[in-house]
Amino acid sequence: MGREFSLENTRNIGIMAHIDAGKTTATERILYYTGRIHKIGETHEGASQMDWMEQEQERGITITSAATTAQWKGHRVNIIDTPGHVDFTVEVERSLRVLDGAVAVLDAQSGVEPQTETVWRQATTYGVPRIVFVNKMDKIGADFLYSVGTIHDRLQANAHPIQLPIGAEDEFNGIIDLVEECAYMYGNDLGTDIQRVEIPEEHKELAEEYRGKLIEAVAELDEEMMMKYLEGEEITVEELKAGIRKATTSVEFFPVICGSAFKNKGVQILLDAVIDYLPSPLDVPAIKGIVPDTDEEVERKSSDEEPFSALAFKIMTDPYVGKLTFFRVYSGVLNSGSYVKNSTKGKRERVGRILQMHANSREEISTVYAGDIAAAVGLKDTTTGDTLCDEKSLVILESMEFPEPVISVAIEPKSKADQDKMGTALAKLSEEDPTFRAHTDQETGQTIIAGMGELHLDIIVDRMRREFKVEANVGAPQVAYRETFRSAAKVEGKFARQSGGRGQFGHVWIEFEPNEEGKGFEFENKIVGGVVPREYIPAVGAGLEDALKNGVLAGYPVVDIKAALVDGSYHDVDSSEMAFKIAASMALKAAVSKCNPVILEPMMKVEVVIPEEYMGDIMGDVTSRRGRVEGMEARGNAQVVRAMVPLSEMFGYATSLRSNTQGRGTFSMVFDHYEEVPKSVSEEIIKKNKGE
């Protein structure tokens, strides 16, 4: 059996948004209208089709991005529902990596919220074309044009409405299509009574004004259209659509549409927009990769004729079939039962079965083609970000980069039986989620788990209990501090031991200097004339890397420094790799007195939404937590305070905000950057870590 849908008629899209903007409901409705679901599940009743892990149904938020296939007007649409909660940014990163386009869902009352900014930035990094869907037009305080304004102000994005709502809040009962110059009126909230009519008289003037603005914005990006526009010629619907499509797929323009997924309004037009304006796998640039042995760069085009290549973007453990590996096929064809090469790990893998996923049911298929998204059963060594490819034509596609965890807690099993199971559970969970780490603290022997935030770790512990039946006690959260150097110095490290028999000798001079923020550790060899033999130089680098894991001030990892090996000496008989490793770590310890080491802490971008009367208390509270208020604005009848606050001061903030605002305030936070800790705090951290 050949391909069911051509590449032009395939769309791989993600649905991304801030928590509670309604994107799971939007996805549900898409599945409903494309004939994949027979009854609609409401998120707030805990029965949504996409949210299928137990915790998601309880909490009403989406944690794992489920990949689902739907069909609309002769097109196949593969949808990945991504979580909007900041602790799960890794899920969003992974999804964006394998998508061709995305729908950003906004809440019509709030517009762009902090998590929207984060996800938008991630999508820009990966060059993903987007449509913006302003959802919840039926909500009190819904304001379409305000929401569009926030896209310009907060995201600096070239976004323009291609629709306008008719009415808002309870009165929201239609949508004007500016491209086709018509309107859709809704007779009820079930989406069963929709009529295409002329634009109502009272809305004509506004519609004309916004259609003019739309044509102008698109013409600016299209020379031919610009000429016609300037000469006053009529621009046809087809030309306008083609112009919008071209500008959207080249990520220069973002069409904005509106609706209410919950009330079944605007969903079909959203699907039309996905097909009209988002790219097919043929519209996006060919993916680049490198050939493992030669490091030469190669391209893989989206075509069934090319050699097979795919990227594994998600691992899940399924109670019935075991380990599922979700992958996106970039080129070629794969049959179930065949062998592929995991070129990242250099391992051969057998693809047992291939499943096409619907939110929580699955359909077995025998072949996947270029542009498809599917899940494989039977892969043993493959983890997130690995490349799978044809054994005869190896390639490694660019992998994904994941942020380092910012928060950790100690965890201990409640009983001996739990202890054995806990190791397995943690290994499986960290395989699924690259931003979750588990390790044993060498000094205390405790098991430490680290992740992107309190909710992230809560859910991990919860999953251990439910899926792996492990009961565990969790300690207080710890912040992932870092250390770095503020000044440069040249220091010596000398290790010489002579105690009968063969001695040990290693001697180095290393120049340390601060590196740019986020650049990590860089080691350079500047030895001339062989004063340290070449075979010992990697040992110096390795010795420094080991020593950097436990910093010099308070034992935190040292980041963002450069080290250059400039001089040293060796002994013909007594020198060894080990001796040079130790000498390098001695040099790092000696650098403490000279390089002005400091402690860095994670700073969180915090947004607090509160009724006006609590403004004073909240501002005072933020300042008392060493926070810097960076801006305030009114949103509807509430006030929004934006601030930068150290993570260490944010523990338990949810409880304190609840009591300060009688439960009427909400907040969200996202990791922003590392910053130097004030001296007084730094002294406390050092004291605490040295057990004084």
UniProtKB/Swiss-Prot annotation:
PROSITE patterns with a match to the protein in the record: G_TR_1, G_TR_2
GO cellular component: cytoplasm
Gene name as annotated: fusA
Cell location: Cytoplasm
GO BP annotations listed: ribosome disassembly
Function recorded in the entry: Catalyzes the GTP-dependent ribosomal translocation step during translation elongation. During this step, the ribosome changes from the pre-translocational (PRE) to the post-translocational (POST) state as the newly formed A-site-bound peptidyl-tRNA and P-site-bound deacylated tRNA move to the P and E sites, respectively. Catalyzes the coordinated movement of the two tRNA molecules, the mRNA and conformational changes in the ribosome.
Official protein name in the record: Elongation factor G
A single GO molecular function term of this UniProt record: GTPase activity
Domain of life of the source: Bacteria
Annotated family: Belongs to the TRAFAC class translation factor GTPase superfamily. Classic translation factor GTPase family. EF-G/EF-2 subfamily.
Keyword Nucleus in annotation: no
Boundaries of every tr-type G domain copy: 8-282
Positions annotated to bind GTP: 17-24, 81-85, 135-138
InterPro entries given in the database record: EFG_II (IPR041095), EFG_III (IPR009022), EFG_III/V (IPR035647), EFG_IV (IPR047872), EFG_V (IPR035649), EFG_V-like (IPR000640), EFTu-like_2 (IPR004161), G_TR_CS (IPR031157)
UniProtKB keywords: Cytoplasm, Elongation factor, GTP-binding, Nucleotide-binding, Protein biosynthesis
